[in-house]
Amino acid sequence: MGLLALGLIGELLGGLVIAQAIAGAKLQPWPLSVAVVGDQYTAGIENRLVWPTLMAQRTGWSVSNFALPDAGFVADGRGGHGFTYQVDRAQVSRPQVIVIMGGIADARFPDVGQVRVGALDAVNKVKVGGERVLVVGPTYFETPVPNSVIRVSDAIKEVAEKAGVPYLDALDPPWLTRDQMRPDLKGPTDEGQSAIADKVVAWLRSEVAQ
């Protein structure tokens, strides 16, 4: 085989490798696009910045926040606020990852079976939509954590584990202190939002790297 032919084959093979590298790169677009579902701990109450915004600033990811106050897997706020509805809206933005952070509003429902059903519905909806779902349990601001909140966290964890979905426990220990909460204890201060961002970013970095 002549030198010219060998040179042409080399160029073709080199072009193929480059094309494959480009194709592979397209499977992992950057920045990572993340949609967040949650309650007032995520939506914020008169905060300058909330943890999803801080996460975007600290990582360079594209983050959309769909959280609404008093929402949960069962709790529905003013109507249409529940996590299943938030997932619907989040999917319209076509994110790669949907992070669902459990809220404390579900703790007022005595039947945790409802929480399991709601959590399974939200998780399955994301999986069917083709996005990757990661679940963070509800957090709190003091110990001992009320049993009602622990029961909700355990129910969500059970659903996530059975569904093969990554779950981050935010109660052992609680991520917040009373000083990081508003005076009415309804949501985190800016300092509390930053504390939540620290925890979620560290965990999410490790998960998306897998």
What are these regions (language model features)?
Residues M1-V37, Y41-E46, Q57, Q91-R94, ...:
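N-terminal secretory targeting modules
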Residues L16, I22-A23, G72, R78-G80, ...:
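Mixed-charge, polar/low-complexity N-terminal
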Residues Q20, K26, L49, R151-S153, ...:
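Residue-level detector of functional hotspots within protein domains
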Residues P31-V36, Y41-G118:
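Conserved SGNH/GDSL esterase-like catalytic core that processes O-acyl groups on lipids
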Residues G82-Q210:
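Alpha-helical cap/lid subdomain in secreted, periplasmic
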